[in-house]
Amino acid sequence: MVQLHNFFFFIIFMVVLCGTAAPVLLKWFVSRDVSTGAPFFNGTIIPILISLFSLLVYLHSRKIIRSMDGAKSGVLVRASRPILLPDIIGRSSSETRARKALFFFVPVLHFCLLESKGDFSYLESFCGVLCLLFFCTFFFLARDRSAKRERARRRKGQTLRPNGNEQRRNDKMRCSGHPHLDLERRVEGFGPLAFPVPPELGGACVGGVPPEIGLEALALPRSRQLMAMAVGHDYYQKVPMKMNISHGGVCICMLGVLLSNTKKIQFTQRLPLGYELHMGKERCCLRGLDHLHGPTFHSICGNLMIYKPSLTNDRLMFEHDESLHADLLLINFPASYKNGKLEHFLHWWMKNRKHNNFWLTMFPEKRYFRERTSTAEVAIHTNLFTDLYALIGTGSSRTGGWYTTIMKLPFIFFIWIGFMLASLGGLPSLLRQLQKDKLRWN
């Protein structure tokens, strides 16, 4: 079923990558525009998710049923009194207590940072903490050394030989006077266990167990091993690092999707030249319009400036550039155009150090073709935390301005990072499975 999981996540991440990264990459490298949006995602992800998710639930339920049926044939050591496992009643050391304290302190700190610095609600901060805990569990899973040794033995085709400590313990546990107890039989991953031998094979014993050999002499399975016996021997195994990376990428991708949808900000308003649009902490100003002419179209290119005013000065001043001092209306920027086309519709962040405010410029475009059709070219600004989308619609100076749409989507970059990590961890496993003659989908 691992192959089906990889195939499931691979399709989802490819669809998300095509819907988020492809427009930007194609615009940067080949200057080609592609249209993506809600129809693309709904028509691609929803049918695939419904079909594959139902199949995954069916296969997973079958695997659990088979594991539970196989566990009924396992042999457990019975006793007249309850046995307290040492893993449960053992006193925790200072290192264990420090690790538990750190495990509780990190989520609280993460919650406070998201709620205060990230300006998230309590529900969004709690969801972020859950994603963090889910991500950390894959790195704090205990390692089963016996399962690791058994896998190494299977790879090399050699017999598993006990080390010196285990050999001395086996010699002490060897019962020469009572052959009805076989203390040398081993169960995969559980160490030495006591299995009764029929009395006709040698000797008899009062009560079934000799008085000199008690339950303390038996190497009982630990709590993690009892869990493995309950659901199958292949349930508790060491999780490889590539699986940690893959699941961590899935968590980051889920966190990016959650935060980008809950913290989405969108404004659509008729904006005259020189007026500002308030978007929370940021402001958007329509500085001017430029007319462009292409081979088959003519277009109107908006000149938008998005900035965040400082706390000391509410107005943005451009003392470092004399051309941007007072009049912000109908200012042409010939350096931004080349051969009648927009060379760069994206300008990186710039900072006014004196007034401690940052600003950027965006150039959305409205194209009119000869076939009496029009398309809207979206201006996109991307950084590690926020994506800004600007779109200009119809309007004129006589009607009072142009309809302008500004959209702010935070943490879209987390989706990209999650996709890269999940692909990095799942690609080697997928390539290794494709080299086999027959794939085991279950």
UniProtKB/Swiss-Prot annotation:
Top-level taxon of the source organism: Eukaryota
A family per Pfam: CcmF_C
Positions of the UniProt region annotated as Disordered: 151-175
Keywords: Cytochrome c-type biogenesis, Membrane, Mitochondrion, Mitochondrion inner membrane, Transmembrane, Transmembrane helix, Transport
Basic and acidic residues bias locations: 166-175
Lipid bilayer topology: Multi-pass membrane protein
Gene Ontology biological process: cytochrome complex assembly
Primary subcellular site in the record, as a coarse category: mitochondrion
Subcellular localization, as worded in the UniProt entry: Mitochondrion inner membrane
InterPro entries: CcmF_C, CCMFC
Coiled-coil ranges per UniProt: none
GO cellular component term of the entry, any: mitochondrial inner membrane
Spans traversing the lipid bilayer: 6-26, 39-59, 122-142, 411-431
UniProt miscellaneous comment: A stretch of 270 kb of the mitochondrial genome is duplicated within the centromere of chromosome 2 resulting in the duplication of the gene. The expression of the duplicated gene (At2g07723) is not demonstrated. It is also probably not RNA edited and therefore differs in all the positions known to be edited.
Function: Forms a complex with CCMFN1, CCMFN2 and CCMH that performs the assembly of heme with c-type apocytochromes in mitochondria.
PANTHER family: CYTOCHROME C BIOGENESIS CCMF C-TERMINAL-LIKE MITOCHONDRIAL PROTEIN-RELATED
Family, similarity comment: Belongs to the CcmF/CycK/Ccl1/NrfE/CcsA family.
Record's subunit section: Interacts with CCMFN2.
Protein's name in the database: Cytochrome c biogenesis CcmF C-terminal-like mitochondrial protein
Biological source species: Arabidopsis thaliana (Mouse-ear cress)
Gene expressing this chain: CCMFC
